[in-house]
Design a protein with these regions (language model features):
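An N-terminal assembly and electron-transfer interface module characteristic of large anaerobic redox
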Residues: 1-161
Length: 161
């Protein structure tokens, strides 16, 4: 859906053929209907949480990141982190391939803005590369988990008081 929608956004931002835009809108509408049917099926199982629709994730990014940002996963990466925070998941691991500068810009660059919107968000960016030492990756995740535990303990103390 992201790639189809990117074509529509490109035409809005830079111009393009109206027929191409209409075809993309039809495809996006079709994918949206499929996504809604998946979500309807998932809703009946208590073991799963229904994911937000593509349209909702796109709406979350409005004013945070531009739709023309397509570096790495572009605005979608930011939208997914915002959706997780909105759903109550405060501890988020943003994994990205090592050396992918576009993902660093899209991922790490938006972490502060996400924390401004949702102060409880505890986000860590972890780079994965076949040659990178696992210790660094594991330590970053452990640090995020320890901060998460501290936040949980502080919340529990507030409830008890």
């Amino acid at each position: 859906m992201f790639k189809i929608d990117n074509r529509i956004e490109d035409i809005k931002l830079y111009g393009g053929h109206i027929l191409k835009k209409k075809v993309c809108e039809i495809l996006l509408d079709y994918c949206d209907k499929i996504q809604k049917s998946f979500n309807y099926a998932i809703k009946h199982y208590t073991d799963f949480n229904v994911p937000a629709t593509y349209g909702h994730v796109k709406e979350l990014v409005k004013g945070v990141n531009g739709y023309g940002n397509k570096m790495g996963e572009g605005w979608l990466l930011t939208g997914e982190m915002l959706e997780l925070a909105e759903s109550g998941y405060e501890n988020i691991v943003c994994t990205q391939p090592f050396g992918c500068l576009p993902n660093h810009i899209s991922g790490k660059g938006m972490i502060r803005k996400i924390r401004e919107i949702n102060p409880k968000a505890n986000i860590v960016a972890v780079d994965y590369d076949a040659g990178a030492p696992r210790v660094n990756q594991e330590n970053r995740i452990k640090l995020m988990l320890s901060i998460g535990r501290e936040n949980l303990k502080a919340q529990e103390e507030k409830v008890e008081a």
